[in-house]
Amino acid sequence: MRSSSPSQPPSIKRAHRQAKKRAIRRRRVDLQCGCSIYFHLGCAGHGFTHRGTHHCTSGGEWRVYLGARKSPLFQDTQSRGPTVYQNEGIPRTDTVQPQPEESVASPQSLPELPSLDDVDDSFWINLFS
C-alpha cells in the first residue's frame, strides 16, 4: 500500500508562481467627491483621510452595483458636495480657520515642575539609599 504523504514536499517555487498569478485582493471605494480609492483587504478597518474628510474602510462606503458590468449607483452624481455657504451676501475674507498659537509656557493642566538643581542633596541620598 502506498503512503498518503509524498516522499518529497511540494516545490516552493510552484507555490510562489501560483501566488504571483493570483489577482491582488483589494476593494474599491467610491467617495462622494468622485474619487475612487483601492485598498488591500488586509487593511480593512483602518480608515484614511482624503481631502480633509476621514473615511472608515467598513461596510458603509462600499461600491453598490446594479448588475454585472454596470456603474455604481452614485457614479453619475455631478456635484462635488453641498455648498458650504448658503448666504452669498455675507463677505468671506478668509476661508481658512485660524489655529491657536503654540505657547512656550507650561500647559494649564500641569503645574510648574521644580528644577532638579533646586532639589536638596539629602533628597537624592534618601532616594538612592
From Swiss-Prot:
Segments of this protein annotated with the region Disordered: 1-20, 73-118
Processing after translation: Phosphorylated at Ser-109 by A.thaliana KIN10.
Record's keyword terms, sorted: Activator, DNA-binding, Host cytoplasm, Host nucleus, Host-virus interaction, Inhibition of host innate immune response by virus, Metal-binding, Phosphoprotein, Suppressor of RNA silencing, Viral immunoevasion, Zinc, Zinc-finger
GO biological process, alphabetically ordered: symbiont-mediated suppression of host innate immune response
Transmembrane segments: none
Protein family according to the UniProt entry: Belongs to the geminiviridae transcriptional activator protein family.
Subunit-level organization: Monomer. Homodimer. Homooligomer. Self-interaction correlates with nuclear localization and efficient activation of transcription. Monomers suppress local silencing by interacting with and inactivating host adenosine kinase 2 (ADK2) in the cytoplasm. Interacts with and inhibits host SNF1 kinase.
Name by which UniProt lists this protein: Transcriptional activator protein
Species of provenance: Tomato mottle virus (isolate Florida) (ToMoV)
